[in-house]
Amino acid sequence: PEGFRALYAKQGDSLITQGFICADASGKTAILGRGGSDTSAACLGALLGAERVETWTDVPGMFSANPRQVPQARLLSRLDYEEAQEIASTGAKVLHPRSISPCREARVPLWIRDTSRPDFEGTVIGPRQAGAAAGVKAISSKSGIVLVSMDGIGMWQQVGFLADVFERFKRHGLSVDLIGSSEANVTVSLDPSDNLVNSDVLERLCADLAEVCRVKVIAPCASITLVGRGMRSLLHKLSDVLAAFGRERVHL
């Protein structure tokens, strides 16, 4: 970081650089993929120990729900790093989840600003505030995800079963998003935005998993996530939420 700051200092008061472009382990030019510009800005800000990182986009910040789907969604003016990470990871597209970690580790605030309303404060993401009350901050959703359900009586308390299963996902280059488990079932979700999930890949994965369990693919699916602090302490207050899932016959 010190060498980087010294290099930056030689450039004068302002440095204009590109995002999205990086180098791989062998030093060859590569691209960071979706959200690469957000990630570049966050990494540069963290390395420089910047006062803040500002991401300018076409929306004023993060909302309590998708405003295109929920017109009464509220703009969230303040979030801590963990809350923002969860909202971004579970469906919000305004900020890539990968861009939050560098700022969190360097304790650099991250601001989301609106290019069409430059005087608007937007959303400020920073350290958790002391005494933050438990509560639901946002509802996020993802669509088009793939569920892989794995059943087997023998999996209960079988040493190494999950390690064996996830090794097979790794073998096929698949990263798991959400996980649900019971005594005789493990269900995981695959996000197509982070994985190459086509019929050929799923067919090979199922053939591999069939060696250790019964497997079923369910797609397309959607996930709905409640994001907040101290959620376990609020379970007794979420009866209306759970009832809404029941009315719509949504599996939990």
Kindly give the residue locations of the regions a language model identified.
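C-terminal catalytic "cap/lid" subdomain
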Residues: 1-252
